[in-house]
Design a protein with these regions (language model features):
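Short glycine/serine/threonine-rich phosphate/pyrophosphate-binding segments
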Residues: 87, 91-100, 105-107, 173, ...
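N-terminal hydrophobic or amphipathic helices/low-complexity stretches enriched
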Residues: 1-16
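Conserved small/polar residues in nucleotide/adenosyl-binding loops
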Residues: 301-308
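Acidic beta-strand-loop-alpha-helix segment within the catalytic core
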Residues: 108-188, 281, 293-295
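Flexible, acidic active-site loops/lids enriched in D/E/S/T/G that coordinate Mg2+ and/or position polar
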Residues: 33-114
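Active-site-adjacent structural elements in enzyme catalytic cores
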Residues: 78-91, 98-127, 131, 178-182, ...
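Short acidic loop-to-helix transition motifs that present clustered carboxylates
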Residues: 59-62, 171, 190-197
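Glycine-rich phosphate-binding loop
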Residues: 193, 202-236
Length: 313
């Protein structure tokens, strides 16, 4: 994949962030998301690529969002020689944070060669992510305590000095309490586990581990970032009823998720390694801040590009 494409894809997240920024603090997360989607699609269709959205915002019947299977790129005038790429997008990671004017909302995408990324339905995913210093020591088949002990040894840090990032959701209440009983420092975020996953792998960050259940699309994007940063990741797909509890509606959604996984040849019981999520190192990752945050400052019209994180290998 041509490295100069990294600059083109940086324009995509910058445009999405600027569009969403106009809705910061206005209480309308759908409008913020739609503005970012429209901007992202417009710029993607100006790039000379043969692109396909493999991780997006739902299925084809949920258009006008950037849906799974949507074709993007400037293909009308060029019939051959285009880069064939798979694209994972999250136009606004942290729609609620954007609507409420809270920190750490970002626009993000990852790009890889055709077939690079796991194609999974938009469902929940259990994630365990670490930086380069603990690469190869995590395993979701083990308990969280065992993984924390292994990371502690790899990083040569006592457990009391480890920091675990986790989404501050009701489903994680017991996990957070258990971590704090161990003496682990907990960084509990309202939303936005992609930004937190990157903090695991960057120099001078306090975050050592990301754990918890979040979105599968965000998980694949995090995997691409770990490829670029040399980190590591394990994941396992989760049905809605496993995460949200058993109700008629949750069971209906879970049955659909199970059927989609069967169609895609995905084993729900399998622990997915980094190689399963992002299959090679030739990836481009771009993120731009919408609101101020721990990873990126917000994007402003006078400062476009200065708050964009571009990673490629």
């Amino acid at each position: 994949m041509k490295r100069e494409l990294a600059l083109e894809f940086a324009r995509v997240t910058e445009a999405a962030a600027l569009a969403a920024h106009k809705w910061v603090g206005r209480g309308d997360k759908e409008a913020a998301d739609q503005a970012a989607v429209d901007a992202m699609r417009t710029i993607l269709n100006q790039i000379e690529i043969d692109g396909e959205i493999v991780i997006g915002e739902g299925e084809i019947d949920e258009a006008p969002m950037l849906y799974i299977g949507e074709k993007v790129g400037k293909t009308e005038e060029i019939s051959c020689g285009l880069e064939a790429v798979d694209i994972a997008v999250d136009p606004v990671e942290g729609t609620r944070m954007t609507a409420q004017g809270q920190a750490n909302a970002i626009a993000v995408l990852a790009v890889g060669n055709k077939g690079s990324f796991l194609k999974a339905p938009d469902m929940y995913m259990e994630k365990l992510i670490v930086g380069p210093g603990a690469k190869g020591v995590i395993d979701l088949n083990l308990s969280l305590l065992e993984n924390i002990e292994n990371v502690s040894k790899a990083l040569e840090k006592p457990i009391s000095e480890l920091t675990v990032a986790i989404l501050d959701k009701p489903r994680h209440k017991d996990v957070i309490a258990d971590l704090q009983k161990l003496g682990v420092k907990v960084f509990a975020m309202p939303d936005g586990d992609v930004a937190a996953s990157i903090l695991c792998a960057v120099v001078d960050s306090e975050v050592d581990i990301l754990y918890g259940v979040g979105g599968a699309p965000e998980g694949v994007i995090s995997a691409a970032a770990m490829r670029a940063l040399g980190g590591d990741m394990n994941a396992r797909l989760k049905l809605r009823s496993e995460v949200k509890g058993i109700t008629l509606e949750n069971d209906k959604i879970s049955n659909y998720e199970r059927a989609r996984c069967e169609q895609m040849g995905i084993d729900l019981t399998k622990v997915l390694k980094l190689d399963d999520l992002a299959k090679d190192d030739e990836v481009i990752f771009s993120a731009t801040g919408i609101t101020k945050g721990d990873l990126l400052e917000r994007s402003e019209e006078r400062r476009v590009g200065k708050e964009c994180l571009r990673l490629c290998r």
